[in-house]
Amino acid sequence: MNCFIGDLQTKGSPSYPSGFAAVGTTTINAETPNLKRKGVWGYHPQPGAGGSPPLAKEQAETDTMAKHLLPLLLTLAWTPAWAQTPPDAVAPEGASAVLTEGGSPAVAQALAAKAAGEPVSADHWMVVAANPHAAEAGARVLRAGGSAADALVAIQAVLGLVEPQSSGLGGGAFLVWYDAEKGELTTFDGRETAPRAARPTLFQDDAGQPLKFLDAVVGGRSVGTPGTPRLMEVVHQRWGKLPWGGLFVDAIDLAEGGFPVSPRLAGLVAKDVEGLRRFPATGDYFVPGGQPLAEGSVLRNPAYAGTLRTLAKNGADAFYGGAIAQDIVDTVHGAEGNPGVLALEDLAAYEVVERPPVCVTYRAHEVCGMGPPSSGALTMGQTLGMLRGRDLGTLGFASAEAWRLIGDASRLAFADRDRYMADTDYVPMPTKGLVADDYLAERAALLEGDRALESVEAGQPAWDHARVMGLDDSLELPSTSHFAVVDRWGNALSMTTTIENGFGSRLMTKGGFLLNNELTDFSFRTHDAAGHPIANRVEPGKRPRSSMAPTIVMKDGKPALVVGTPGGSRIIGFVQQAIIGYLDWGMDVQAITAMPHLVNRFGTFDLEAGTAAADLAQPLEAMGYKVEVKDLNSGLHAIALEDGRLLGGADPRREGVAIGE
């Protein structure tokens, strides 16, 4: 099964029989290095906290249990032993502890499983989201008989409140959806669009030079037309089972009653005080009285509750017109020192686009995700396609040779990404040629040898277009959020959602939500040094290229693994590594979220500090790589479907949990 977009031959939304699929063994066996059980992943309880095993599913989930167990789990404080903030192009969102108080028995059980490094197991449904409040909201919907589409609405509404720096109503999202009744995969593009008044020189100064990055980010210039509210509505109208208005109740209650500020949110606010204080409304919320939000303090957002009530009553049209739309436009145009050009007409014209998935074959599975304007599925598909003929399973995680192959295949794929990939509604692209078997075999031949490739260049895939595109060097920031859901009917979704940079444009509307800075995902330049036009340049109405890679891995036409992560352009490496861990190295779904990261996009190998990845620095350097050991904070969330069971895993680097029944 191969399904693509653009100029690829396509089967449209491929038909599969409904139900779940067994994926073979996912336990670490005698032939596989027992990395997880030896604890080399680096996630350990704090000294003196003990090592409480996960609660048995059969144990009654009582309020008393939660009351006494949760404080113990919170002492485990999900801060990896290596947590640090090394220099980077832009500092990633940091690893942090979980919520400081509150939580249900289901959250207590989820935290216990996470602390023990074990998946959460369920029979009927599963949700994995980036914050316990959001996961609980999704779980309540599913428990009440709601579908994955219903859960999506509830989860996103809560994420915009408790994790406002990462996603929200003012941003965009990509969704991969499996329809169990029809046995079909499809994807939805809720990416932000450039305003109609945007010009290719939007991020250039009067001399035609690119602006400094953060000068472009902070303010109205970087704000694209949000897509998330319309995406929520489109998916609910198609697959929702519960009334739309009731799906916002949890988020409204939290916004009005307040919630404790998590260590992660508090830490990120403290690191960005000056940016957040740039605009009064944002500063008043995140830095009240000149003091950054304190961990554990109760934060309320009645304005956001009001916005949600309006959406609950009147639907997404109330966001894209009327008072909310006018407030968005006024906020963008009123950004002192850096106003933008977003107009009411842009909001009124916004549409979500349904697109066929991009799928590539790997280890007898089909790895399916978003096509352009996302580069995620294509770049990951190219990398995995180049590795098909390599026995990574025998080499294992601890092999420098395995990482040489993965790293250089990724570099070759990123070279193609930077030259060719953009919004195919605006730019012609060799989509079919990039993942053609003969082209991938040609690129894979470059991996022969035992040393790092000295340099990589974009290839020349088959293409019926003569245009030569320029090389892009746009920067995609390591923020964003992700969640995964499987419901009782077998519908599955993988959704990556974002406002781009942490806290986006730093502009907060009167409606209590932040606006994105998504337009800075475009190239700031229009042409490269050779004079070739850059595919990912700014154009009116265009969607900026993304690395977001929500993924559903299929086996025999049925979902086997639902996975995704935040992380900027490292998203691609994080997700493909999780898939390799699952399919090649026999790791379970929790282990693949905790696996140490090694990522190579542009020649330098980024190795995750304080983990087994750092042990590979010397052998990789001996192969000719430049190596940097640094904090790499993914937020992987995954659900495996094995023999009729659902297994959920949540990245211990962040606050997410898996809840299922």
Mark where each language-model region is:
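Internal maturation/activation junctions in enzymes
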Residues: 104-105, 389-499, 508, 519, ...
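Extended C-terminal subregions enriched in glycine
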Residues: 541-543, 575, 584-631
